[in-house]
Amino acid sequence: MEDCLHTSSENLSKLVSWAHSHGTICSLIPNLKHLLSEGSHGNLTAMWGCSAGHAYHWPLTATCRAGSQERVCFQDNRSFNSDSPSIIGVPSETQTSPVERYPGRPVKAKLDCNRTRDSCDFSYCSEPSELDEAVEEYEDENTLFDMVCESSVTDEDSDFEPQTQRPQSIARKRPGIVPSSIHSSSQGQMVDECSNDVIIKKIKQEIPEDYYIVANAELTGGVDGPALSLTQMAKPKPQTHAGPSCVGSAKLIPHVTSAINTELDPHILSASPSVISRPIIPKTARVSLASPNRGPPGAHGTAHQVTMQMPVSTSHPNKQISIPLSALQLPGQDEQVASEEFLPHLPSQVSSCEVALSPSVNTEPEVSSSQQQPPAAPTITTEATAQCIPAYSTKLNKFPVFNINDDLNGLCTSAVSPNTTKATRYALNVWRYWCMTNGLKDHTDITKIPAVKLNELLENFYVTVKKSDGSDFLATSLHAIRRGLDRILKNAGVGFSITSSTFSSSTKKLKEKLWVLSKAGMSGARSRNIVYFSLSDEEEMWQAGCLGDDSPITLLSTVVKYNSQYLNMRTLQEHADLMYGDIELLKDPQNQPYFARTDSVKRESRSGSTRVCHGKIYHEHSRGHKQCPYCLLYKYMYIHRPPTQMEAKSPFYLTARKEATDMGSVWYEEQRMGLRSLRGIVPNLARKVKLENCENFTFVSFTQVSRRLGSHSCCQ
């Protein structure tokens, strides 16, 4: 037994850690069961275990590394039964063929592990025939874990029986844990000390309800309920063509049956959906079928080598990650706290592992549920979850995101700008969340609410709507939500707008709320140290082509510039509220045409109001027609504008078309320009001429230029 002392401190630490973990789940004291035969490199492997079936294979040397050979490991097959001594680490020199040992039986498939953190390391050596082949090397054995203890605190005597009602799958194993816990079998094989006979011994089976480990989990959810979305999960590779070597999605799920002596055949691994009682969610597991020529000569052409891998990242699929033993979450420690904190309403029927791998509706750059789950896999839904879990997510520090497939999602889609689509869907989610949290689930579809009833709801909505954390929205955000809801109604063709006079009472409530938010410092307006453009800056803009009528963007930027200068429009709100009918083409007493901002659309709601001119734009040809404010505004309003957007109540600023070719005379879409795009026009002009502090330039930055030019703008 002196050879047992020839081991590394790391391996000794692993043995002590396993013994400690074993003591938390089993009252039996483990001891040294077997001293397995030497491998081709002269190292030994000791098997520690107890009479309950808990086993640990302990390498006795630290110098003998895997090098250029392939290791033997258990496959996660609950009905696994093999007579091959290579499974338990017996070297090939002392092994006899399964056909010789058991006549009449077909040759069993040899299981083989590539370099992956899932390997169980039952033997550090292999046949001499494999040593000369160029395969991946195990450079750091510290990243490999040798624990194969397959039980938990919740194990009962019934766990020793075949689990016919509890099919196991590779994908439902706990991600990011000790790899040896992933590879287990319902039967362990041990070599007797006094004979070469193979002893079949049942090992306690682990069920997902026992415990799970989540490394970096965040609370998400969907229609089917909350879920723990793993942030370090990798996208499973699509299944490729069948061949000697292929990597595919882990759809090979073994089904646990009562037939313990079932032959190890590749056909067993493909389970039919009809016999799967629980959904198959191949979140991270994948199967590699290695080339037959990499195995020993005796197994060439007959034995398929299967490897279970748990990739951590798509960029380095073979890179191993060392997980400290202190990070292990033992049963009964943190699981209960996490479940009580994040999943208070989760039914007990749903296992913790299923919750950890259920599809998420998170829209951040993680693996989508369609990529994580095959089309044939059923969704985890029960009547209990449908009754107690709302149909929206509860992601931490994020506003709820609904995943309801209805016609409203199509109404939010914009073919012009993805930002508009995002803002419209956000407004829809805010409305739905407000309705569901205020007992108004029948009114979540805003397009089916009559105008009078909707006006009453909006009066309460503008005053009481809040974020998911209970705080108020900024004034600009609340205004954008209103525009998003109005956009949905317009796309649905309901025949009314929430900005019309029919909704005057709700509009009044909105203005009162906006005034309160502004007084509280929650207007949302950026506080900037305003910087003014100089004459040289403006001249550089013209020369650089940033201003003019050469493209839809330049013409729109020029119109914004002149409206700010000559029509006294100084804030984003004034530009955003501007309607087509608010600017009129008039004539003065000298019969000179000019454009004036009269706000005629806003005056319709004011009885007895007289026309007030907030500014005028005359012809100015001192610098030519290319820079005339009157001519450029005329082109924007009457030449390059869609005919359907020339009504008085049409929005003034429209989204510019991005395709410069084949536009014809119409340069703009039939859609209002977004607030973000409108706000960024002036900073973008400053950025194009390479000015500093571009974000400090606003619509007011053009004021001094207009005074120096001596414009025709005036107020009456």
Curated annotation (Swiss-Prot):
Keywords annotated in UniProt: Isopeptide bond, Phosphoprotein, Ubl conjugation
List residues, modification Phosphoserine. Answer: 97
Q: Where is this cross-link: Glycyl lysine isopeptide (Lys-Gly) (interchain with G-Cter in SUMO2)?
A: 201, 204, 237, 283, 626
Map out region (Disordered) in residue numbers: 84-103, 153-189
Specify the protein name: Uncharacterized protein KIAA1958 homolog
